[in-house]
Amino acid sequence: MVYVYINVLFIANFCSWGTTLLMGPGNWLILFFSALYAYLLPLDLQPRVSWTVVGVLAVLAILGEILESAAGAAGVTRLGGTRRGALYSIVGAFIGTFTGAMMGVPIPFIGSVVAAVFGGALGAFGGAYLGERERLHGDRFAIGKGAFWGRLLGTFGKLIVGAIMLALVTVDSIF
């Protein structure tokens, strides 16, 4: 019966990991479901998720957030952007992600995901561009481009951390 629970945990964590593409709290959901599993699974059932792994997952979730935030902010500030530009970039990424997810692109099965990721990056570009409105067009464009690449790299980094978390908890729950 424990292997049924392991499969449910894997499916919940995999779906949670996927929410990262939509600016969702995927890594935090992986941590939540894994901690809930470790807490609720009866002690006599083996194998189980250890609390040590749950602690490592917490550290990795924090690392993923820092990585995503730092990449996005660095994309704006590295090119001389202001805090307002960085804030507008975050808001633009949020709007772009959901607009992209709703509109999608005509790629079977993964069109909405691709559109959400690139919509978020384009939204970050637009937000940073609007946030630097007192600058010249060339500077605004460069800062927006930095926000675009920062958003893409931040999302990619957070996805990698989430994949490590998913692999870690899956291996620990099986062995």
Regions found by a protein language model. Name each.
Residues 1-4, 38-54, 105-106, 171-175:
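Helix-coil boundary and interhelical linker segments in multi-pass alpha-helical membrane proteins
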Residues 1-19, 85-95:
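Small-residue-enriched transmembrane helix starts and helix-helix packing motifs
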Residues 29-46, 96-104, 118, 122, ...:
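Interfacial segments of multi-pass membrane proteins
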Residues 59-104:
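Helix-adjacent hinge/juxtasegments
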Residues 30, 34, 53, 57, ...:
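Alpha-helical transmembrane segments of multi-pass membrane proteins, especially transporters
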Residues 12-30, 95-112:
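Transmembrane alpha-helix interface/packing and boundary motifs in multi-pass membrane proteins
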Residues 135-175:
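C-terminal binding/interaction regions
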Residues 11-21, 67-77, 130-134:
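C-terminal ends of transmembrane helices
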